[in-house]
Amino acid sequence: MSLKSCLMWVLGEHDEPYRKARETILKLVGNTPLVRVKKCLPEDIPEDVEIWAKLESFNPGGSVKDRPALSMFLDALKRGLIKEGKVVIDATSGNTGIALAMVGAALGVPVELAMPANVSEERKKIIKAFGAKLYLTDPLEGTDGAILFVRELVQKYPEKYVYLDQYNNPANWKAHFYSTGIEIWNQTKGRITHFVAGIGTGGTIMGTGRRLKIYNPNIQVIGVQPAYPFHGIEGLKHIESSIKPGIFDETFLDRTIFVETEDAYYWARELAKKDAIFVGQSSGAALWACIQLARELAKKGEKGVIVTVFPDGGEKYLTTALFSDKD
């Protein structure tokens, strides 16, 4: 990009959603940029096998989870579940918690969250900054431990809490069905051939994938999971060894690619160094899956437009092993 073209973009030739004034921060959720990943890719990936990523860190809460958080809140309000004196509660690995805390602050609704104690310090501090109450659960139990903790609390105080239950709430995947999938189709002008996404609750891949399959049933929907039950890829679940999210249907996927923690970390760092895209480890996992897929297409002499989701930015992981001092 030339200096002139860069300045022209800054002066107003960028996309319409970023030019409009907004009455509330919540109206900035969605309509995130789609950017091509190129410079960090291995040399054996040809130009006609494209990899594109939705930069979900551009959401006001900093992650893809702003979409389902807002959707679940609005659904609960519409159904009359959130009333004066009620507290919204859920289990989270971090990003949904941040998003729920943000939405709660914007709407004036108190929020309580449970999450594993070993998540990054940044996530804990951001949640508290939004005014939410935080419970820390056994890190060895992962998000499953947080889920069980919340269930017990809700069972004990049913009149106090509105349990959004992101792992089983249809409003989660519908957020992507009515936003992310449409955005990707429009941004690629219908050229997308493969959609790749990490699996946590399953909301992103189920909602986006369902929408894309309506547009074009030939689009391949590919899930990304950690290779092992004990892993360091925050936000992703090893489904076989975890409490399976009720909204996730593995039979819907065309395939699943398993990623090791070290590869996820490596490619997250490469994205920052070479493409200037600063993301977390789940984005590194998604990219590594895309690279493996791109290599398969290249070997068969096929073209492709692979689109993935980079769930969040790297700011929340600066104190973790992801960005510890490495060359």
Swiss-Prot record:
UniProtKB keywords: Amino-acid biosynthesis, Cysteine biosynthesis, Pyridoxal phosphate, Transferase
Protein name: Cysteine synthase
EC number: 2.5.1.47
Organism: Aquifex aeolicus (strain VF5)
Modified residues (N6-(pyridoxal phosphate)lysine): 65
A GO BP entry: cysteine biosynthetic process
Catalysis: reaction(s): O-acetyl-L-serine + hydrogen sulfide = L-cysteine + acetate
Classification via SUPFAM superfamilies: Tryptophan synthase beta subunit-like PLP-dependent enzymes
Broad EC category: transferase
NCBIfam families: cysKM, cysM
Family to which the UniProt record says this protein belongs: Belongs to the cysteine synthase/cystathionine beta-synthase family.
MF-aspect GO terms: cysteine synthase activity
Stored Pfam families: PALP
Cofactors, names only: pyridoxal 5'-phosphate
Cellular component, GO annotation: cytoplasm
PANTHER family according to UniProt: CYSTATHIONINE BETA-SYNTHASE
UniProt-annotated binding residues for pyridoxal 5'-phosphate: 95, 200-204, 282
Biochemical pathway: Amino-acid biosynthesis; L-cysteine biosynthesis; L-cysteine from L-serine: step 2/2
